[in-house]
């Protein structure tokens, strides 16, 4: 099974400690529970940074990494105590006794005692690393501990003089995926690909968009991915021109396209695939003409992405393909170079070509100005060109209301890239063949 080992979490914690100053502590807080309505909560989703260092999926938890000097450090987890009554109602808790063995931390303390314990752990240190402003409850806990230290000089207490945000360091770490992470992302891609394939096979005119949403989520669940990594987009007809359309409530009509942007979350990591296909299984000529431009853009990107390139550089090649294609169809008019200089493509391709992918679907990490950061092995990103012709656009009528995006997930390797989501078809003739075959079953 693809998952992150205890040893991997320990390596990550050690890697952060090595970047900390001597005489310091890093505090990483779990996400709080979020109320849905009245006394009902949303399904709990752990803070991605906390998960990155622990793999622990309970609220009311804090990881403390203490670096005394360059050779001495230790880890402390504050977490909820075992409580028979609470566990009958709401599920099992790990508790303090099992945490060191399960999670690989040095010791565990009760979260209910954090106000009595945290200031003692911080006493005498010079620096505290804390993501101030992320969670109000976390700021209250940290500020309370520091205030106790500042007021305790007569008891030989001293507070850290410096607070540093650990997020820039941690998010740079998260940008480069380990082999274990890539294996999990590969599985997330496989499950997501199977769900998109299922949607193509099940699609029929007269169904509603939410029917395909249900088929997709069913396939996620069948393979151990309980939740989507973001709100599923199923946009048929003109809805495909709305980038983050999530109502998913319209009837899918014969002759329309349907754009599906959906990904599963597997072991905390996100899949993210988009496919666009005809509701009736057969592209019209106008749909195919737009689709071919987007597909060429994707295939060119997949050839170009490798170490030493950048999102900015590859985007430039994609824009040229798009503008040239739109000129040939009469959607744009003029010289290709002049149109590119004028950003004439922006009304039809208004989002970025790629974003980082990992524990978050829009994962953390610096892109550089205009996404000019040079790509390196271990980076994982999406490739998602799209063209969206608004229903009221002043273009030839047959193209109005067509929205097409095609998206794959890749990891940059030493020699190029690996497509993590190649197993779901995207060539028009392959899509049509798949949908025709499904209708015969």
Curated annotation (Swiss-Prot):
One of its GO terms (biological process) is proteolysis. One of its GO terms (cellular component) is protein-containing complex. Mn(2+) 1 binds at residues 272, 355, 384, 407. PROSITE patterns: PROLINE_PEPTIDASE. Its EC number is 3.4.11.9. Mn(2+) 2 binds at residues 261, 272, 407. Belongs to the peptidase M24B family. Its main location: cytoplasm. It is found in: Cytoplasm. GO terms for molecular function: aminopeptidase activity; identical protein binding; manganese ion binding; metalloaminopeptidase activity; metalloexopeptidase activity. Its cofactor is Mn(2+). It is an enzyme of class 3 (hydrolase). This is Xaa-Pro aminopeptidase. InterPro entries: Aminopep_P_N, Creatin/AminoP/Spt16_N, Creatinase/aminopeptidase-like, Pept_M24, Pept_M24_MAP, Peptidase_M24B_aminopep-P_CS, X-Pro_dipept-like. Homotetramer. Coiled coil: none annotated. It comes from Escherichia coli (strain K12). Pfam families: AMP_N (PF05195), Peptidase_M24 (PF00557). Binds 2 manganese ions per subunit.
